[in-house]
Curated annotation (Swiss-Prot):
Protein name per Swiss-Prot or TrEMBL: Non-structural maintenance of chromosomes element 1 homolog
Ranges of Basic and acidic residues composition bias in the record: 243-252
Transmembrane domains' residue ranges: none
Subcellular location: Nucleus; Chromosome, Telomere
Record's comment on post-translational modification: Ubiquitinated.
Pfam families referenced in this protein's UniProt entry, alphabetically: SMC_Nse1, zf-RING-like
Species per Swiss-Prot/TrEMBL record: Bos taurus
Subunit structure: Component of the SMC5-SMC6 complex which consists at least of SMC5, SMC6, NSMCE2, NSMCE1, NSMCE4A or EID3 and NSMCE3. NSMCE1, NSMCE4A or EID3 and NSMCE3 probably form a subcomplex that bridges the head domains of the SMC5-SMC6 heterodimer. Interacts with NSMCE3.
Family note: Belongs to the NSE1 family.
Gene Ontology terms: biological process: DNA damage response; double-strand break repair via homologous recombination
Enzyme class: transferase
Amino acid sequence: MQGNTRRTGVMTDVHRRFLQLLMTHGVLEECDVKRLQKHCYKVHDCNATVEKLEDFINTINSVLESLYIEIKKGVTEDDGRPIYALVNLATTSVSKMASDFAENELDLFRKALELIIDSDTGFASSTNILNLVDQLKGKKMRKKEAEHVLQKFVQNKWLIEKEGEFTLHGRAILEMDQYIRETYPDAVKVCNICRSLLIQGQSCETCGIRMHLPCVAKYFQSSSEPHCPHCNDYWPHEVPEVFDPEKERETGMSRSNKRPSRSRQH
């Protein structure tokens, strides 16, 4: 997350090109954001020293502030990869997606979102989502059409699909954090470690506190026998590995080559 105190800077052609390209993507992993920044310097100011990414983004955010837009930093819930998304702060509703989707498509997203938030796992099956098609507002939608719309949500990085089930993409979590907290106050889950919104993660079987998988990994990094940070009972779940960009670079792994694994709350 960006801090509240920002250094007011002056937007150059480098910043403007970066912002324009980020807008076309909506959300990018940090490694891609750094590559994008270097590309923009190469195109517009190849002799300049590449500014520290945090300062570079703060300069852009200081200009975007009056437009109620912000480049926000978050992490993916499944493996803790840093991501950056261009977030619209002017509205806290699903209507911020309105320029890309029709009314009945937005309502389908709301239905999927509600199922995801209400679930214990952070996932909603395609079957359960499609069963709600008859309840959609606006133009009638067939199940085949709804399947296509769900794939559009995936392509636009609002949802992630794993083994026929859907969960929220990091972009959706960054964009809709406030909306989710206000709309589903009784169902919303918060990580015991970072206090951020939690969709998928692990939970203590004794006291019920929940933790993001990356937070689990970091908290228990040096523990041979992990115990709950709240009640001190034994933590029975498998502790995932912490995302390490250097290690990933060395092994030459890319996310596209990884077989997606199911991240479940327990």
